[in-house]
Design a protein with these regions (language model features):
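Early exported N-terminus immediately downstream of N-terminal targeting peptides
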Residues: 24-73
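Sec/Tat-exported extracytoplasmic proteins
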Residues: 81-82, 123, 152
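Short, surface-exposed coil-to-beta transition loops
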Residues: 99, 112-118, 129-131
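Solvent-exposed coil/turn segments that connect beta secondary-structure elements
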Residues: 106, 122-125, 137-139
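C-terminal partner/receptor-binding element of secreted or periplasmic proteins
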Residues: 128-154
Length: 154
């Protein structure tokens, strides 16, 4: 019985996270689509995870891949999702999106307001060029979201 209850809670957490992410273009890169590429790192967290709880998160999804290959894929998806953002901080270099932080419109799930954030960084000029995408949602504020991004970039 305890195992069944735990399974149901985990599934509910996954559903809640997926519903907040529903309708976003960035979903096209998640789900293991590029996992056969050894340069790609993908992480998806939802449900009752200690890290999520400690940061007031419901969902955390990250994608990192080689800049040359993945920035042309990620950039249009990020910009499409950022079109209707309620807050933004965007930087271009040489006509390419270098940095973006979007505050997406909140959604309501199970009677709770879920704040949603999207972060993109293209480090094409670094020693190890990479394009990184981070989506996260939860009850955290903008200030908490910015602090979380700083901690994840380290």
């Amino acid at each position: 019985m305890k195992r069944l209850l735990t399974t149901l809670i985990v599934l509910l957490g996954i559903f809640a996270g997926a519903s907040a992410q529903k309708g976003l273009e960035i979903n096209k890169v998640f789900g293991g689509k590029y996992i056969n590429d050894p340069t790609v790192t993908e992480t998806m967290m939802s449900g009752e995870q200690k890290f999520l709880r400690s940061h007031n998160l419901s969902t955390l999804a990250t994608f990192r891949g080689e800049s040359k290959t993945y920035s042309p894929i990620l950039q249009p998806l990020v910009l499409a999702d950022g079109t209707n953002a309620i807050g933004r901080n965007v930087r271009y270099r040489d006509g390419k999106l270098q940095y973006a932080f979007f505050i997406l419109k909140p959604v309501e799930t199970g009677g709770k307001k879920i704040n949603r954030y999207l972060y993109y960084l293209n480090n094409e000029n670094s020693k190890r060029p990479s394009a990184m995408l981070i989506y996260f949602d939860g009850s955290l504020s903008r200030t908490q979201a910015e602090s979380l991004i700083r901690s994840l970039k380290k």
